[in-house]
Amino acid sequence: MADSNDTALEPFGSVQRTHIGREASEPMREDIRLLGAILGDTVREQNGEEVFDLVERARVESFRVRRSEIDRSELADMFSGVDAHQAIPVIRAFTHFALLANVAEDIHRERRRAVHVAAGKPPQDSSLAATYRKLDAADLDVDKVADTLTGALVSPVITAHPTETRRRTVFDTQHRITELMRLRLHGHTRTDDNRDIETELRRHILTLWQTALIRLSRLKISDEIETGLRYYEAAFFDVIPQVNAEVRDALRKRWPDAKLLEEPILRPGSWIGGDRDGNPNVTPEVVRHATGRAAYVALAHYFEQITALEQELSMSARLVKVTPALAALADACHEPARADEPYRRALRVIHARLTSTAREILDEQPEHGLDLGLPRYQTPAEFLADLDAVDGSLRANGSRVLADDRLGRLREAVRVFGFHLSGLDMRQNSDVHEEVVAELLAWAGVHPDYTSLSEPQRVELLAAEIATRRPLIREGAELSELAQKELGIVAAAARAVKVFGPQAVPNYIISMCQSVSDMLEAAVLLKEAGLLDISGSTPYAPVGVVPLFETIDDLQRGSSILEAALDLPEYRTMVDARDGHQEVMLGYSDSNKDGGYLAANWALYRAELDLVESARKTGIRLRLFHGRGGTVGRGGGPSYDAILAQPPGAVKGSLRITEQGEVIAAKYAEPRIAHRNLETLLAATLEASLLDVEGLGEEAEPAYQVLDELAALAQRAYSELVHETPGFVEYFKTSTPVSEIGALNIGSRPTSRKPTTSIADLRAIPWVLAWSQSRVMLPGWYGTGSAFENWIGTDPDGARLRVLQDLYARWPFFRTVLSNMAQVLAKADMGLAARYSELVEDADLRARVFDKIVAEHDRTIRMHRLITGQDDLLADNAALARSVFNRFPYLEPLNHLQVELLRRYRSGETDELVQRGILLTMSGLATALRNSG
């Protein structure tokens, strides 16, 4: 699929003059050519010359379109009426190419970093090495460092996503191809077992071609749970303990008296199986399965490592000394064998106790169990104490190098993963809480009509309920199906906390939180399940209540809601029971859908400023949880820049951030790439916490005023299109594949929270995914161009433009907003979007909406150039520029085929091949864009 002299990577589109360093990128281009050629050979061998010729013709014509040599309609005509049997392999070919291009890009990142290091250049920004240099230069006060990093936590939270539809087999095969390309990177022509690398590539690409890329049945939550868990074996078990140890050691070396990071700073989380907001498929059984499978994966890893250590630590008592603690541990092993091998005997004891633990807490037993009749570990701390005894003995007797190896990694892993693996958040919509709590209060005779009460009355009633130990419901109470289900889910969470430890379910998130009573309703449900008790002298609150502010209005009121809750003695007691920590989640997705890109970003920034001030006034330790999606329209973009763009005081050593779908695969599917991405999260967190990165000083308030005005203008322009244009919902539903996202078994969750046609009720993921597939990318830019143009106005002396140019140069937040927007604009394609608009049968509606979109798109690019001084959208992002050049012509056929198949599907041609083709195009585009939803 790629000629040896392929000139198709020449510049195109709105970013065509970007200099991407042709010499620097040539090795990647060679990798892409190699993989593309092997794929082309595979297509020809497996599907014949006719299919190969169609694929190759589509590829060549796509490049000709990009060079403006032919009109796009000629490519569209090629696929008009194409037989579905032929369309499927064409779609698969371009989808596979996108997947292989991802491999080549990932390998090239490693190559560029290696070149950078070999050249002796300073560490790259976003690396921990660069961050340590900045911290050293800042000459920080040790007390400030210690206070800031108290309770530090950086937590990537894995969430389910409808575009991550790849099967485990595909995931594993891609991993093997990556390993082979990595060997080539280091100059090898043969594998470790003497196999020819190119032959192996052909074998694995053939396997990939013959493997179904996607599931044809609707994803079950159990499938999504397994998808999330696979990243632990793939990368997290190796990388997270390693990075935690590296950061802890580096910081303690700089500030040895500060006792920094006594708990691991990097701890993963998950929503999969606990997020029931709008997902009726989450049940008590699902929560139990999610927490149980997570614990299984953790303990299976420990068994594997303990078994390996038993083989490795074979030292004889005749040759080495041991500590009394190790000797006592070994003496608990009564097996007659290995009498002269104290470390092996000690590890057998650990192995046996871990087996007893697994048998008591797991429904499914891992391999490598050992039954010696020894008692279980009651807590991970007990398990760790025995490992520490082995470690201490090794270090005390000249074997530090052994202690630092597998045993050291295992000890770090236990600190992070415990028996729970990752914390599973519970999430539910506030409307559901209100309905259930109203039923419980009525059943218990506390109040017959809770929903009729005013907000102050609700707060008074709920606070009183929280303060008492008495439950509202007795066993066997006759409740509605909804109430039984909700109470059952919280009870399943309580079981997980009891069985796997308090970190198993750390948070209860309230979606669409709009009041103090919304927070207290969740607390009442926690109390019913035994997860909250503030009635005695020792308050118990293992699960934090986390308000999620999602709309722009709620973001603006979030700090006042939080302060009002903290004014209540009952709620303050709950927070104090959690060492004064209060988490607040910020919704990037719904705020963007509500008010548009610029207004949402500014509302989030303002909300953070206000919440930081509220935390200062009330004396709590605030942790912000950023509900970011993969796309810019859902808060995505480079993590390092995004974290540094946070307002002063908003990070303070801690943040959590959602990771979703194909973005998870892009960041965490490989240990080396995972290490780099996790390192980036930590580097940005440390810099944002300990350094002054905002850079505005006394000019902050004038800058904030400018953004207040710009955000209002942007929201006005966005609302005029999305919320006020007659027929807009119809245009959206017919010009994008949003309806098919729900109909074609993508993801376990419905596309809307409620069965309505309202944009407000539509979930943010399908909203953004649909616009991404149709190449409009509207959520990532619309309204911003109008805001800038209107704010600058006539401005005869250019003063206002200079204000914006100065903010771009000095303020990380503003620069990041424009940089992320530029990435979206570079991926948008109004020519392809026009093809999708043709799916709208009402010509007047089509013209009315699409003309507005095109005009705003052009306006936004023009304003970006004025403010940044850059003619090219990707002038400051060479890596993305390379990606755009290398892969976007290969997306063109996928878009044209998607439009063709959507037209057929909607006209009644609903056979299985057409449906599968649409699903495959969605998967292919998501794979190629890498952050589509």
Curated annotation (Swiss-Prot):
Domain of life: Bacteria
Gene Ontology cellular component list: cytosol
EC number, UniProt record: 4.1.1.31
One GO MF term: magnesium ion binding
Catalytic residue positions: 161, 593
Catalytic activity: oxaloacetate + phosphate = phosphoenolpyruvate + hydrogencarbonate
Keyword tags: Carbon dioxide fixation, Lyase, Magnesium
Protein name as annotated: Phosphoenolpyruvate carboxylase
Organism this protein belongs to: Mycolicibacterium smegmatis (strain ATCC 700084 / mc(2)155) (Mycobacterium smegmatis)
